[in-house]
Structure formats: structure tokens, C-alpha cells
Amino acid sequence: KTDYEANEGRSLDLVTTLGEDVRRYPVRTELFSRDDDLDARVLEHIDAFFAGLPAAGPDHEAATRGPWWFFLSEKVVAITQGRSYFVWDIKVGRPARVLSRYVTRTPAGIGLGSPFTMQLAIQEAGLPRVLYASAGGAIGKVIGRKGLFYELVGNQINAIDGPTEYSAYPSNVSAKLAPKDPDAVAARLSAAIRERVPEPWRSTFGGTVIMDANDIGRNVLGSDVPGDWTRFEEMFA
């Protein structure tokens, strides 16, 4: 598959609820590791995309004449920051084992329903805050208010991912935290992209969006684009 073709079962084009016609180009990469230089890897693919654009056909050149943004998976950022861990390297304590039993699992992923991911949450937010949020979450279930745990715990704990059997290696044996300082990462990447991309695309580049996405929703974790980010979450559908 080239970078100018849709993924299987997907379409390049989308019309948002605001009536915007959007084209999404899924750029395929190799696996990332904590030893990778994120900026260098990203710029390599940006260079290749625009270098191949003229040969891709007039339809693609026409579609890229307007404003555009670069979307990046938060997993890639977290992995290159060293915030992804093999499960055998995570020292799980008793609180994590106990608390993880009371987490409702969803089809979107394991969430904090694993001792490994719960341990990362405790390390990131602190045990007192996790206990406080757990108590609030239990009350939220009684009164019918979903998501109260994540509101109370903060620290982007909702972006923690755990190992799943259907994931490709190493995600099937890893758990990861949310990326650190995603707004700053987005701003840094945008500055580097603006230095590399030729005109006219340099002038129409709007910025970088770091996205957390799964089967039930999308959430922008960081961006250097001002304003409401919900439109970007819809574009990523």
C-alpha cells in the first residue's frame, strides 16, 4: 500500500458534521522503539510523502492544496519517550492487583483492568489520588455518571494502554503511559515540518495533532493548533 491509498475498509474522504470535506492520508511506518529519534523518523516520512505527491496523480495534488494538519498516534510519542514497558519489567504491587479487579473492561481495550496498567496509573498519579478517584468512580456508578474516575484521577490516566492478544508485538506484551508534554512535542514537530516542507504546502500547514484513538472514540492529547480540537477528533474517525 502506498501513502496515497486508504487502509482496508476505510475511505480517504470524509464529510464532517460541519460540512467540511476532509481527505485523510494514512502514512504507513515501521514499528517504533524507545531507541528511535521521533523527529527524524517523522521527517523521513514527511519528506517521502511530498516527494512522491506529484507522481501520485492530479487528484492528490488538488486534494492537498488547502489547509492541512499532521496527525500522529500518541502511542508512537510515548514509545519513543521510553514510556512503554514490557509487562515483565513492571513491578506490580498489591494495591494494583486489588484495584484492577474492580475495573469494567470494554471492547475498546483492557484499560486499567490489568494489574500492569493499574500499577502504571499508581506510579503516574500516586496511590492516594487513585484511591480517591476509585471512591468517586464507585459513587459515579451509583448515580449513573460515567467516567468520573478518570475526571478525578487526571494525569491523562485514560490514555494508559495495556497488553492485548490481538495487538502486534510488542504491544501484546507491553503497557504504556500517555506521552509526556504532548503539546510541546506537537509544537516541536510542527516547527521541524515547516522547515522541511516545500511551498505551497508550507504556507497551508496548520500544525500537529497527537491523537489517542480506539474503537469507541478519539481524544486529542496534545496539539499546537489553537481553538476547539473536537473537529480533529471527528476527522480521525
Tell me what each language-model feature is:
Residues K1-A237:
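N-terminal and secondary-structure boundary signal
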